[in-house]
Curated annotation (Swiss-Prot):
It is an enzyme of class 2 (transferase). Keywords: Cytoplasm, Fatty acid biosynthesis, Fatty acid metabolism, Lipid biosynthesis, Lipid metabolism, Magnesium, Metal-binding, Transferase. Its EC number is 2.7.8.7. The gene is acpS. One of its GO terms (molecular function) is holo-[acyl-carrier-protein] synthase activity. InterPro entries: 4-PPantetheinyl_Trfase_dom (IPR008278), 4-PPantetheinyl_Trfase_dom_sf (IPR037143), ACPS (IPR002582), Ppantetheine-prot_Trfase_dom (IPR004568). It catalyses: apo-[ACP] + CoA = holo-[ACP] + adenosine 3',5'-bisphosphate + H(+). GO terms for biological process: fatty acid biosynthetic process. Mg(2+) binds at D2, E51. This is Holo-[acyl-carrier-protein] synthase. Belongs to the P-Pant transferase superfamily. AcpS family. The lineage of its organism: Bacteria, Pseudomonadati, Chlorobiota, Chlorobiia, Chlorobiales.
Amino acid sequence: MDIVDLVRIEKAYDRYGRKFLERIMTGEEIELCLKKPSPLASIAGRFAAKEAVVKALGTGITAAVHWKSFEVLNDPAGKPFVRSSQPGLLPEGCSIKISIAHDRHSAVATALLCRGPES
């Protein structure tokens, strides 16, 4: 689980612009966020989700598991999911389930590392 203050994300984005986004997200993630009615809330939500995922994996952000090792995307119904671009990121037979929420002040995300097939 992770919670992010939207003001923190806003300050980083105001200071570094797209460079900030390119450091923590893939191009597809960036485009998804910038298309949203509240781009900062979407950016904060994905940031929180990425933090929650690395906590669930027990690794944190490292040289081996970095911001772009996986993407936080949405299925056609809008449900968030994790797509790994790094072979072996997840333990064999495991999947990750995520949930993201936000309000005017913060974004929160939860990630669960699940054994067994994806559902």
